[in-house]
């Protein structure tokens, strides 16, 4: 299996700082990431949890670690589903990259995800994320709505 990458880009009619806040503020992430809020101190090496209330109890749906952060232009973190039937080892974590740039009040957000080829069930996980070519687009559309709403 060669290098598998899912990458999507969207233009958002909002300043880069607003888009950045949408990506890292737990009150904002709940609006576009299936009700999940982020829990992190956003420092390299720190844990990052995506948690939500499910059937009356707090549950972590995705966990990982912050790899790199350069507000408001770059965020890199790892992800794994702690509820999946796979060992919680570094090779099974995927990488997610947010890259932002702004020109004339319009922010370009590019999200890419890789690491599938070394991970357990990598090809299946790639196909799940790739989603017949949609990739991150459904989530990016929701991020755009939240950021543009102010």
Segments from the language model and where they lie:
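Short aromatic-glycine motifs in intrinsically disordered, low-complexity regions
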Residues: 49-57
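Aromatic-glycine hotspot motif
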Residues: 2-16, 67, 101-111
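Short, solvent-exposed aromatic-acidic interface loops
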Residues: 79-84, 112-119
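Hydrophobic pocket/interface hotspot
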Residues: 19-20, 29, 48-50, 66, ...
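Hydrophobic ligand-binding cavity/cleft-lining segments
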Residues: 1-38, 43-44
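Hydrophobic-ligand binding "helix-grip"
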Residues: 38-39, 59-106
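Soluble or luminal CAZymes and related metallo-dependent hydrolases
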Residues: 58, 92, 131-135
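A conserved amphipathic terminal alpha-helix motif
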Residues: 115-150
């Amino acid at each position: 299996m060669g290098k598998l990458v899912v990458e999507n880009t969207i233009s958002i009619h909002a300043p880069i700082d607003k888009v950045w806040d949408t990506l890292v503020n737990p009150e904002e992430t709940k609006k576009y990431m299936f009700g999940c809020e982020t829990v992190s101190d956003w420092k390299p090496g720190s844990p990052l949890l995506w948690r939500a209330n499910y059937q009356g109890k707090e549950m972590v749906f995705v966990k990982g670690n912050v790899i790199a952060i350069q507000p408001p232009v770059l965020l890199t973190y790892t992800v794994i589903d702690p509820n999946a039937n796979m060992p919680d080892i570094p090779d099974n974590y995927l990488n997610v990259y947010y890259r932002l740039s702004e020109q004339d009040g319009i922010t370009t957000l590019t999200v890419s995800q890789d690491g599938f080829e070394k991970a357990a069930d990598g090809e299946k996980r790639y196909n799940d994320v790739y989603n017949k070519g949609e990739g991150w687009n459904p989530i990016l559309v929701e991020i755009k709505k939240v950021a543009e709403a102010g």
